[in-house]
A protein has these predicted regions:
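N-terminal secretory signal peptides and thylakoid transit peptides that target proteins
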Residues: 1-18
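N-terminal Rossmann-like dinucleotide-binding module
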Residues: 17-89, 167-170, 267
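N-terminal Rossmann-like NAD(P) cofactor-binding module of classical short-chain dehydrogenase/reductase
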Residues: 111-112
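Beta-strand-loop-alpha-helix segment that lines the small-molecule cofactor/substrate pocket
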Residues: 116, 121-169, 183
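Conserved SAM-binding strand-loop segment of SAM-dependent methyltransferases
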Residues: 93-98
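Residues forming the Rossmann-fold NAD(P)(H) cofactor-binding site
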Residues: 57, 121, 261
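Glycine-centered tight turns that cap/initiate beta-strands
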Residues: 68, 107, 184-187, 275
Length: 445
């Protein structure tokens, strides 16, 4: 029990420390949440689900494992996804095609958002305005300004907003972060993050534009994004593969924001930082001849105070790095830690006489990260305490990935002010921090 309490205290302090730099007084804001949303630990919690594709259905099944959760409604603009979610949710749940109908349901206390990335900001902000707490998938936004508005909405309307970077709820991730912060592998000066895959030879292909399926509201799917003809890859929802909308700039940010956010989130947590000071990127669409817009090969270098972090992705060669197809390697003066969802390993550096400079450690994953992460959200919904991945943290982690994409797209060496969230001396890059919404949609807090 004492060890568990120490770990809990570490997590609380590290989360609050990450938020302290924002200047926000979080505890009072959450303590003043409206009485309607404050529920006792034994009360049922009515939850609505917006976006019921592959990730949305996974979240639905996970939340339903918690005894207090009652699924009040499921919502999707695509009929097959909606029908599948309705079957999982059961007869009591309403099946809706327009998320605004879901937000009008007074009985709903919390909303789980797993819509396409370009919808995350509006779904979250409008849910906060409707008095709902929110669990939103990563990346929180496509544009950095959207993420900042999401933070503002959570604070203004006194909402609990948890971001779905579920690795933060993994016990071995928590221990790994604690070991890094405690100096177990010494001074960390270099970090590598990566995820590799092989989409050879055709990638997502080149389907022509055409008419949307009859059971898809294409205009509502596009929402604030520019109006364009339907293309199967721009929509790209399929239960057996990654949704291909992720490879188009108007809706997402490629692997950089899909996988990179997970990896960079842990880096910033372990190193107790809120953002880099310099960013450079190299890469391109170097092999695949499909109609994706995002690169199939990318390397981004982030300069932080005291260390360098690299993110690497390739979609044309899946060879693993030291047995890891994805992960994080922290390189310290005393040893190296390899960390992924399966566990972590510490490999000591040695003296000239072969003596280990730190203890070798191997630890495997020991809990269900998704279940623990949703549990944390539900507990905070009741207690009004800050969740383990509050929207401020999720926004910061997402923004690092967005900066990598901006460096790649502008071919610039970017100088960044993390606290002010602005570039120094690069107007072109600065224009890529915000989006122009298609009418009638507006980004308004």
């Amino acid at each position: 029990m004492p060890q568990k309490m120490q770990r809990r205290d570490f997590l609380r302090k590290s989360t609050l420390a990450a938020l302290a730099g924002t200047g926000l007084k979080l505890a009072p804001a959450f303590a003043q949440a409206s009485p309607r949303a404050t529920v006792s630990p034994n009360d049922k919690v009515a939850v609505g689900f917006i976006g019921t594709g592959r990730m949305g259905q996974s979240n639905l099944a996970t939340f339903m494992k918690h005894p207090e959760v009652e699924v009040a409604a499921v919502c999707d603009v695509y009929g097959p996804n909606l029908d599948a979610a309705a079957k999982i949710a059961g007869e009591k749940a309403k099946a809706l095609k327009d998320f605004r109908q879901l937000l009008e349901m007074q009985e709903i206390q919390a909303v789980v958002v797993a819509s396409p990335d370009h919808w995350h900001p509006l779904h979250t902000i409008l849910a906060c305005q409707a008095g709902k707490d929110v669990y939103v998938e990563k990346p929180v936004s496509v544009y950095l300004e959207e993420g900042r508005r999401m933070v503002e909405a959570a604070r203004r309307y006194k909402r609990i907003v948890q971001v779905g970077t579920q690795q933060r709820s993994g016990l071995h991730f928590q221990k790994a972060v604690e070991l890094i912060r405690n100096g177990t592998i010494g001074k960390v000066s270099f970090i590598r993050t990566w995820n590799y895959g092989n989409s050879f030879p055709e990638g997502i292909g080149n389907p022509p534009n055409g008419d949307p399926p009859q059971d898809l509201d294409w205009d509502l799917w596009l929402g604030p994004a520019p109006k364009v003809p339907f293309n199967p890859n721009r929509f790209g929802v399929h239960p057996d593969r990654w949704s291909s909308f992720r490879w188009f700039w108007n809706y997402a940010g490629g692997m950089m924001t899909d996988w990179g956010v997970h990896l960079l989130d842990i880096v910033q947590w372990a190193m107790n930082v809120e953002g880099p000071s310099e960013i450079t990127a190299q890469g391109g669409k170097l092999y695949l001849q499909d109609n994706r817009e995002t690169p199939d090969t990318l390397q981004v270098t982030y300069q932080y105070p005291g260390f360098v972090c690299v993110y690497e992705n390739r979609e044309c060669n899946g060879a693993q790095l030291d047995g890891h197809g994805y992960g994080i390697s922290f390189h310290g003066s005393l040893g190296t830690m390899f960390l992924d969802r399966a566990g972590f390993q510490i490999i000591p550096e040695k003296t000239s006489k072969g003596v280990n400079l730190c203890e070798p450690v191997t630890e495997k994953s020991s809990n269900n990260h998704n279940l623990a992460h949703s549990r944390n959200f539900l507990d905070c919904l009741k207690s009004r305490q800050v969740p383990i991945c509050d929207i401020e943290i999720g926004h910061r982690s997402t923004s690092v990935a967005q900066l990598g994409n901006i460096a790649y797209r502008t071919k610039s060496h970017l100088l960044w002010e993390p606290r002010a969230e602005e570039f120094r001396g690069n107007q072109r890059a600065g224009k890529m921090l915000s989006a122009k919404y298609r009418k009638p949609w507006r980004l308004s807090v």
